[in-house]
Amino acid sequence: MARYLGPKLKLSRREGTDLFLKSGVRAIDTKCKIEQAPGQHGARKPRLSDYGVQLREKQKVRRTYGVLERQFRNYYKEAARLKGNTGENLLALLEGRLDNVVYRMGFGATRAESRQLVSHKAIMVNGRVVNIASYQVKANDVVCIREKAKKQSRVKAALELAEQREKPTWLEVDASKMEGTFKRQPERSDLSADINEHLIVELYSK
């Protein structure tokens, strides 16, 4: 599947917020002018219409999770079919992606690196190798690093970085074993308040 391979900081500047596409726990606004649009001089951002605001929010979330447009739309359709709040269902589906769970557990420094670990068959779910980044992890699934991948320096570095991040309450991780359990789907209160999923629902409801 095609992936965006351009500058990561450019995407964060376009959305006006840190999308956490680079490794590390320090906010990137100390390294680049995040409030400015991409480009050498950072052209002034125009005032957005309601549609523009909704579109930017969708792009921000889509890029945060590293999902392409068609797949993101399919996630929305699935979220709308499920019972409950469509916006919260959408976030739950994105959080349940295997590459995201690997990132949340601290096995990858970024979601992109976590996706690579999955595609390179370095990840096991319930004792079986899974190399599909979009695989939906379910409650009580056990995710771990394959034995032969445990010596990779990038995995060890990612775990060290994860120690500096807030630990998700819906996961249980044993860093020494490089293993974690997906205890439950995260609740809306567990996730970033910077995401306004209602804008995405409004966008796709038109």
UniProtKB/Swiss-Prot annotation:
PROSITE patterns from the UniProt entry: RIBOSOMAL_S4, S4
One cellular-component annotation, GO: small ribosomal subunit
Gene Ontology terms: biological process: ribosomal small subunit biogenesis; translation
Family to which this protein belongs: Belongs to the universal ribosomal protein uS4 family.
Protein's organism: Enterobacter sp. (strain 638)
Protein name: Small ribosomal subunit protein uS4
TM helices/strands, residue ranges: none
GO molecular function ontology, one term from the record: structural constituent of ribosome
